[in-house]
Amino acid sequence: MHLLIDSTGIKVEGEGEWHARKHGGPKRRVWRKIHLGIDEEALEIRAVEVTGSHIGDAPILPDLLDQIPQDQEIASVTTDGAYDRRKCHDAIADRGAHAFIPPRKNAKPWRTITAGAVARNEALRATKYLGRALWRRWSGYHRRSHVETKMQCVKLLGQRLMARDFDRQVAELQVRIAVLNGYTALGIPVTEAVG
């Protein structure tokens, strides 16, 4: 399985963006962050975590990987540069997967010798040798657009959460994900290039 991971924000409280710009923002605008992991082939959401807006992306990656059963092999994990951290690379390497994470612009090689650090240093060398654009094409980084599309589908079911309690907000998002996975299970259209 090729796992694609990203996160997005869902509004809980506060006015819309237009209202905030026109009339000034209210003092309280609350967001929840939803972290998704999808299977690239089936386009099914396999892992989900909901956090407050103050939690970063990188600390959640090991929890997302833990939601995939240990007996299921993960071939690769593709994420954005926010996950370029030792803990993320080590968690991916511990699952025996390849990490496709673009190194940060000011990245330096890591001195520690772990499987995750070695893989990250190889990716850093490749981006410096090939350039970022060619590395993205070579590594198949463009596949990450599938998770962006799936997050847009989550937002099509509602851009804000109705529940006030955090546990109920998590349940509300779990219902949305179950609905999306149900639609995905019905079938994915196959497109073919003409010409």
Feature roles, as predicted:
Residues 5-7, 121, 169, 183:
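N-terminal cationic amphipathic segment used for targeting or macromolecule association
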Residues 1-105, 109-111, 116, 172-177, ...:
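Polybasic low-complexity intrinsically disordered regions
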Residues 81-154, 162:
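Helix-centered, glycine/charged polyanion-binding patches within enzymatic domains
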Residues 37-41, 62-65, 124-130, 151-157:
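Short amphipathic alpha-helical segments, especially helix-boundary/capping motifs
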Residues 132-195:
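Basic, amphipathic alpha-helical segments enriched in Lys/Arg and hydrophobic/aromatic residues
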